[in-house]
Each structure stands twice: as structure tokens, then as C-alpha cells.
């Protein structure tokens, strides 16, 4: 009987050696928000607690400066 292999989650920021997550890096931040604009939890993405806090802060700053939307476009 074949077993399902689940890939181990890991923190991409820790693996790449990122010191701090920048709120101006919209391409990276978009990977961590849903279509509706919610921040994806770390249990889904595998991000460590330290970087999840930085990520949430960066997304909130980008939203405040209108770099990212708060919600979807409602179309």
C-alpha cells in the first residue's frame, strides 16, 4: 500500500538568511496573504514565530501605505 508523503515545512526567511522583512518588498509579501487579503498563518506556511511577527508587521505597514489592499476587489 502506497503511503502519502507530506513535504516538511520550513521557514524560507531563515533558510535564505534574511535579517529583517521589508514592507516595501511587495512581491514577497503577496505570497503570505490570501486572495481575500488575510495574513496566512505560520502553521500553513511554515514560517518561524520570529519571522511571522515581522511578516505581519510588514504587511500591516504596507496596507497602511496603500501598497497592499486590506481586502479583495469585490468584483
Curated annotation (Swiss-Prot):
InterPro entries: Ribosomal_bS18, Ribosomal_bS18_CS, Ribosomal_bS18_sf. Keywords: Ribonucleoprotein, Ribosomal protein, RNA-binding, rRNA-binding. One of its GO terms (cellular component) is cytosolic small ribosomal subunit. GO terms for biological process: translation. Belongs to the bacterial ribosomal protein bS18 family. Part of the 30S ribosomal subunit. Forms a tight heterodimer with protein bS6. This is Small ribosomal subunit protein bS18. It comes from Idiomarina loihiensis (strain ATCC BAA-735 / DSM 15497 / L2-TR).
